[in-house]
A protein has these predicted regions:
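Conserved cytochrome P450 K-helix/beta-meander segment immediately N-terminal to the heme-binding cysteine loop
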Residues: 306, 324-350, 431-432
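Cytochrome P450 heme-thiolate "Cys pocket" and heme-binding signature region
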Residues: 70, 230, 235, 271-278, ...
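Cytochrome P450 heme-thiolate monooxygenase catalytic core
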Residues: 43-51, 67, 83-242, 260, ...
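Cytochrome P450 proximal C-terminal region
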Residues: 5, 95, 143-147, 266-268, ...
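C-terminal domain-closing interface element
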Residues: 168-175, 283-299, 303, 410-434
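N-terminal membrane-proximal hinge/A-helix region immediately C-terminal to the signal-anchor transmembrane segment
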Residues: 1-70, 85-97, 117, 129-134, ...
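Cytochrome P450 I-helix active-site segment
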Residues: 88-92, 139-145, 200-207, 250-297, ...
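Cytochrome P450 catalytic-core helices
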Residues: 239-264, 371-387
Length: 434
């Protein structure tokens, strides 16, 4: 991708069959024109067809127009404001529960452990589930699905539906369909039970969706509910776990960064409120820089043009796919001097426009869980750094690898837990008690 930019400039084209052109954009001014253009000029949902086998036709990611806007407004509230903050203590407790089981003085892969935390958090947010047989089954099935879809073959399988078919006992297509069928059974069973015994006092997302009515007074169908729940389960934990793992790596790879963060955390009161933690400037800067240097998604969700359009001096024809490239913009030396260097201070020195820094996409397709993901990142990092003495098991640099549509650290980042800090000396210890 970077070599193409160096060779062809800030707008280059790839061919994706049937005469369709896929344009990668990395000029912030051009990206601003795309993200501020009338959304009606694009088929953004149709551009995400490779997600259909997992999230279904009724997913927010595949919708356009009024229906997309209606679903977006419905799903936004739980991930913002007071509803989001209500999950703060849960995040700290779940982090402590998982980390307390880590082996002492022997290496372990961090990423799978952080994914346990993120999946538990999203199961609570979406279903209100923290334990029980269904919760355990969903954890196991989601783990199996991610192993299938984030493998190299799984990435190829997403682009070629013929590979998703069942060709026998050893075919990946059979295993994929089996796992999806089992997940669907769990989701539909939960929907039926909750619809039958509806409890409006519950605050989870499924309750909100069950109570929702469209302009004609009709509730969402079971299939619509299933597709939105599946979208939230997939998008709501794997990406966040990857971002947190990258942050843990950088903090422990660079001693000066870790020392500065620990000093900032130590400045908190003995029993701070969660708002004080998430407002810490250097902690914020670490999270922002983590999402800059290796953004979880390399591009925004692409947009298919419905009409001819001239943008930034370029003429684009209908059916062209436009993809603002997050990674290439975040690596521009004119915006970020020494872009391959992890330096959180750059976010304390200046502000960047939403077309210069956009790890969660932009416009009406911006990730609805962006605020929640950052909230979770900060609280997980603060809990781990104040509760545990951790070191990297290996000093060599960790390189990024493609994990499905995300960019993850190769090897999952090996850590060694040396022990726990004294609970008396840790400022957020009281939030981690079960």
């Amino acid at each position: 991708m970077r070599s193409c930019q160096h060779r062809y400039g800030d707008c280059f084209r790839a061919e994706f069959g049937a005469g369709r052109h896929f344009y990668f954009l990395s000029d912030p001014k051009v990206i601003e024109q795309v993200l501020t253009a009338n959304p009606a000029n694009f088929d953004s949902g149709r551009a995400n067809w490779i997600l259909r086998p997992t999230v279904g036709d009724n997913s927010l990611l595949l919708l356009d127009g009024d229906r997309h806007q209606r679903h977006r407004q419905l799903l936004m509230p739980p991930f913002h404001g007071e509803r989001m903050k209500a999950y703060g203590e849960l995040i700290c407790r779940l982090t402590e529960q998982v980390a307390s089981q880590w082996p002492l003085n022997q290496p372990f892969a961090t990423r799978p452990e952080i994914q346990k935390i993120s999946l538990s958090i999203i199961l609570q947010a979406v279903f209100g589930l923290t334990e029980g047989p269904r919760c355990d089954r969903l954890r196991s099935l989601m783990d199996a699905l991610l192993k299938l879809t984030t493998s190299r073959f799984g990435f190829v399988m997403a682009f070629f539906p013929i590979l998703q078919r069942d060709y026998g006992a050893w075919s990946p297509g059979r295993r994929f369909n089996q796992v999806m069928h089992q997940i669907d059974e769990e989701l539909y069973a939960e929907i039926r039970e909750r619809r039958h015994a509806f409890d409006p006092t519950r605050s989870d997302i499924l309750t909100l969706l069950l109570a929702a009515r469209d302009e004609t007074g009709q509730p969402m169908t079971d299939v619509e509910l299933r597709d939105e729940l599946m979208t939230l389960l997939l998008a709501g934990h794997e990406t966040t776990a990857t971002a947190i793992t990258w942050a843990i790596y950088w903090i422990h790879y660079l001693p000066a960064v870790k020392a500065k963060l620990l000093t900032e955390l130590a400045s908190l009161e003995k029993q701070p409120d969660l708002g004080a933690i998430v407002r810490l400037p250097y902690l914020n800067a670490i999270c922002y820089e983590t999402l800059r240097i290796y953004p979880i998604a390399l591009i925004t969700l692409p947009r298919i043009l419905k009409v001819p359009m001239e943008i930034g001096g370029y003429q684009f024809e209908p059916e062209s796919l436009l993809a603002p490239c997050i990674y290439l913009v975040h690596q521009r030396p004119d915006l970020y001097p020494e872009p391959t260097t992890f330096r959180p201070e750059r976010f304390l020195e200046r502000q960047f426009s939403p077309y210069e820094y956009f790890p969660f996409g932009g416009s009406n397709r911006r990730c609805i869980g962006a605020a929640f993901a950052l909230y979770e990142m900060k609280l997980v990092l603060a809990t781990l750094l104040t509760r545990y003495e951790l070191t990297l098991a290996e000093t060599k640099p960790v390189v990024p690898i493609r994990r499905g549509v995300t960019t993850a650290p190769k090897g999952g980042v090996k850590l060694i837990a040396k022990g726990q800090h004294s609970a008396v000396s840790t400022p957020i210890a009281s939030l981690c008690q079960t």
